[in-house]
Amino acid sequence: MPILRGMLGKVPSRPKGRVRNFIANKEFGTQSDIHENVISPGVIIPWHFHETEEVIVVLEGNGECRTDEGAENYSAGDVIIFPPRVKHSLKNSGDTLIRQICFFPSDPATKVLEGEYPGQTVDVFNASEWAKPIP
């Protein structure tokens, strides 16, 4: 069992940015898909859904979660669970970074329903390319 150290902690490169840092996925040889999301204040993750369940563990910050049922605020320590194919969007409504871990039981097959909002950027990292496995 390898232990991968220093997997978390990337930050957006621009003020209106966010980071998607892949921690486990098929490139790691895992069936599950796990990534760290880091979202700058004011940034909105566009409407999308996944073919699998998504579980989000919020480590830092606070935001707004939107679904067809409405909007609800969330903060550090909360867990958000989306069943398969539930359309959702997340917004950092606070003044600090949101840091959250997203878990999927398999390839999420994400379907994005709209483009990035003007001025927003996404930095994507695959930790398998830079993390050091410890045997």
Model-derived features with residue positions:
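Short beta-strand His + acidic residue motifs that chelate non-heme Fe in jelly-roll/DSBH
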Residues: P46-W47, C65-R66, F82, H88-G94
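Conserved short histidine dyad/triad with adjacent acidic residue
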Residues: I34-H50
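A generic "binding-loop/recognition-motif" signal
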Residues: E51, G70, V86-K87, T96, ...
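Short acidic-glycine-tyrosine-enriched beta hairpin
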Residues: E69-P84
